[in-house]
From Swiss-Prot:
Gene name of this polypeptide: uppS
Superkingdom per UniProt: Bacteria
Assembly and oligomerization: Homodimer.
Entry EC no(s): 2.5.1.86, 2.5.1.87
Catalytic residue positions: 73, 121
Protein name: Decaprenyl diphosphate synthase
Gene Ontology biological-process entries: polyprenol biosynthetic process
Cofactor binding note from Swiss-Prot or TrEMBL: Binds 2 magnesium ions per subunit.
Record flagged with keyword Metal-binding: yes
Binding of substrate, residues: 74-78, 86, 90, 118-120, 122, 124, 241, 247-249
Length: 293
């Protein structure tokens, strides 16, 4: 529930009671999501607090990034550093994704988009590709009820060619289950590439022009945006990449045109909601000019 101080509104959830359930306990895999009290008075359930019991920093509503995009990088390196197979890093990243979802709700973010599998990832070994596709399917199946209880709206974003039908099926079920939720919208980018998205939009517009449905001279940015995978995804405010790498990697090229970039050194399996909050605090200190002086 948002609080008001003076003329400013703070959307952060208040600190949880000390005995409120915590997450994540990484001693087992899959990481177990704790039982949390059901929401009351038509509200959704409050997310479990972090195991550290840290609370989200107070940031005024007009300074909280509305849309945060995250490149979840470093799973393979995390596993290699520990003498494990790359897939073990991906497994440990599942709990981090759920944890930052909880943290995003606590701090007041309304849109979260995560890069789970790129169109370039098909170049990886057949074994890893098969694992990642199956893993995405199982994560959605395993976590959608927990996320639904917290008011999360789940959506898949990506290209259909080459995408496993079984993965699309699980996303479709999750989207139908959560379609009316309004606490936060999470876009899971699987088989997604920014250039591919733009090319597919251009192709659709070109076909409409050939069919005489539109005048090419009247094509605008707004018209183009309507042909992207999800026309209602807002522009990215904060773009986060973990693992210390500093590049966009073909992610949300159109939507992130004016995003603020924060690069954090932690590998994804070591990341948690406190790191997300730190990125939000850095975002607050940025001067967004949008081309103005």
């Amino acid at each position: 529930m948002a609080t008001t101080r003076g003329k400013k509104t703070y959307p952060q959830l208040p600190p949880a009671p000390d005995d409120y359930p915590t997450f994540p306990d990484k001693s087992t895999w899959p990481v177990v999501f704790p039982e949390i009290p059901a929401g009351t008075n038509g509200r959704f359930a409050r997310p479990p607090q972090h195991t550290s019991k840290a609370a989200a920093p107070k940031i005024p509503a007009d300074q909280v990034p509305n849309h945060v995009a995250v490149v979840m990088d470093g799973n393979g390196r995390w596993a290699t550093q520990r003498g494990l197979g790359r897939t073990e890093g991906h497994k440990m990243g599942e709990a981090v994704l759920i944890d930052i979802t909880c943290g995003a709700i606590e701090i007041g973010i309304k849109h979260l988009t995560v890069y789970a599998f790129s169109t370039e990832n098909w170049k990886r070994s057949t074994e890893e590709v098969r694992f990642l596709m199956g893993f995405n399917r199982e994560v959605v199946r395993r976590r959608r009820e927990n996320l639904n209880d917290m008011g999360v709206r789940m959506r898949w974003v990506g290209s259909r060619p080459r995408m496993w039908r079984s993965v699309i099926k699980e996303f479709d079920i999750a989207e139908q289950m959560t379609v009316d939720n309004d606490v936060i919208t999470i876009n899971y980018c699987v088989n997604y590439g920014g250039r591919t998205e733009i090319v597919e939009a251009a192709r659709a517009l070109a076909q409409e022009a050939v069919d005489g449905k539109i005048n090419p001279a009247r094509i605008s940015e707004a018209m183009f945006a309507k042909h992207l995978h999800r026309a209602d995804i807002p522009d990215v405010d904060l773009f986060i990449r973990t693992s210390g790498e500093q590049r966009a990697s073909n992610f949300l090229l159109w939507q992130a045109a004016y995003a603020e970039y924060v690069f954090q050194d932690k590998l994804w399996p070591d990341y948690d909601r406190r790191d997300l909050w730190a990125a939000c605090e850095e975002y607050v200190n940025r001067n967004r000019r949008f081309g103005r002086a």
